[in-house]
Amino acid sequence: MRGRPASFLGGRRMAPQSCATAPSDGSTVLLKRDAFGAVWLCRDDARTWIRREVGSVRWWLRPLARAAMQRERRALLRLRGVDGVPRLLANGCDHLDRSLLEGATLAERPPELEWFRSARRILRQLRHRGVAHNDLAKEQNWLVLDDGGAGVVDFQLAVIARPRRPLLRLMAREDLRHLLKHKRAFHRAALRPVDRRLLARRSWFARAWRQTWKRAYNVMTRRVLGVRDGEGT
């Protein structure tokens, strides 16, 4: 992915800019900025990494942005050593540093069938560690890594609980459903009967979300905050 940092987030490349919380002796490129903060590609002589920064968020949204960032921190700590998940490098009150995953979005590099097997292995590891991503409908949260395997980023909305808790099991099932939706988009003929049954059975949470909170969420994020989340079908 080196040389095409904007691909990491599915956004357009932006010119290098200064970052108040980025190393002063390195270089930074702004990859994304929205109502909940900024994401930077940071480089120095020894390494390249990603920094999420929330210090510039409007004061009334800052507590929410900090809470989401700390949720990502907790998730990454639980997922240390899982292939295809960024490593937590450092964090502070208003920033979080994580390792860079070299790869491209699903739109930029349509995944091969083997990629979906790799993605399912990641989801099994997440559930085993007590984490559900909770935002995998978005194509940009999945990566096709340079070796062809799967990668997952952006754990701000993750659900963290004991693996056997009903909520965790429910949300892990929704993660799998969203992966199968992407499989249907790229390899419909490869769907197994069990995959089709799972896609057809939307959980009570998914039904309630679509009928009630999703509408309010879309109004808040798109009309009030001007954030387009790129959620998949």
Indicate where each model-derived feature is located:
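Juxta-kinase regulatory segment immediately upstream of eukaryotic protein kinase catalytic domains
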Residues: 8-29
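ATP-binding glycine-rich loop module of kinase domains
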Residues: 27-70, 74-77
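Active-site beta-strand termini and strand-to-loop segments that position acidic
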Residues: 41-45, 100, 145-146
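Conserved structural core of kinase catalytic domains
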Residues: 65, 77-80, 84-118
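Conserved hydrophobic core/spine positions of the Hanks-type protein kinase catalytic domain
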Residues: 122-125
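Catalytic-loop of the protein kinase fold
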Residues: 128-139
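Conserved protein kinase catalytic/activation segment
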Residues: 140-152
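C-lobe/activation-segment region of protein kinase-like
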Residues: 149-233
